[in-house]
Amino acid sequence: MNPNYIILFFLVVAVIVLFYFVGSSVSLWIQALVSGARVGLLNIVFMRFRKVPPKLIVESKIMATKAGLDISSDELESHYLAGGNVSRVVQALIAADKAKIELSFNRSAAIDLAGRDVLEAVQMSVNPKVIETPMIAAMAKDGIQLKAISRVTVRANIDRLVGGAGEETILARVGEGIVTTIGSADSHKHVLENPDLISKRVLEKGLDSGTAFEILSIDIADVDVGKNIGAELETDRAEADKKIAQAKAEERRAMAYAREQEMKAQVEEMRAKVVEAEAKIPLAMANAFEKGNLGIMDYYRMKNIMADTQMRDTIGSPDRETPREK
């Protein structure tokens, strides 16, 4: 094979590869050149080898240059390689510059890498955001439940976006303040008559400390009367006391019944002793006759007394029927 053809083949392949890498980069280089953004052609070419999208970097560089910001392409590349959103950061810097808010590229990149939306934060610094809390229920000292909904106007604090708490913390603190204010009120009517009292006391607590926001105002949107929790608690307590009293009464009744049965058993026991003693009387009389301690007249006198006693018992018995009833 002719060596010239081999050389020609390699030259064609080299031209194709060069055109692939340089062709698209030339258009971006010309675009940056006419826009006043200084980005070297070789720098654009080697961005592909660094796995950096040249189009994104060049367009972001042009955007910053047109806005009067001096940001190097190396800073944009490093932020992209760190996993940041380059276009979002540049847009945030432009918005901050127009709003006269001091924000450096490093600060903006740090906010973006921290997971915050830096552009939204800048916009919230210019146009405060209104956050509506869910319905919060609390009970005043008179036992009446109140349900309140508030609207919190917040502004992003650029200096505390990194490491500062988010909206959830603001909502939780505002809810805690509302519950505390309502709970400290002597009467629910006082809160209904002065709903701004809640806003004033909550604002005095400095709830935005340690957060990424600055609370501008807290407005009570709605206050409704809920349940009479105090009355419900008293009812439940009375019902519990009633059940306790019933249990104690049942216990006393059971003890009284047991005592009654015990006394009946004792009565029967005493009757048995009486019967036993009566059964011994004939034996005692026989012994008295043998020893001469009891005479025949004494015996008959005792029998007469016993007969009279039995007759009186029979006459006085309520179960005895009269002759007319028969």
UniProtKB/Swiss-Prot annotation:
The keyword Nuclease does not apply. Keywords: Cell membrane, Membrane, Transmembrane, Transmembrane helix. The chain crosses the membrane at residues 6-26, 27-47. Coiled coil: none annotated. It is a multi-pass membrane protein. Found in functional membrane microdomains (FMM) that may be equivalent to eukaryotic membrane rafts. FMMs are highly dynamic and increase in number as cells age. Flotillins are thought to be important factors in membrane fluidity. Belongs to the flotillin-like FloA family. NCBIfam families: PRK13665.1. This is Flotillin-like protein FloA. The lineage of its organism: Bacteria, Pseudomonadati, Thermodesulfobacteriota, Desulfobacteria, Desulfobacterales.
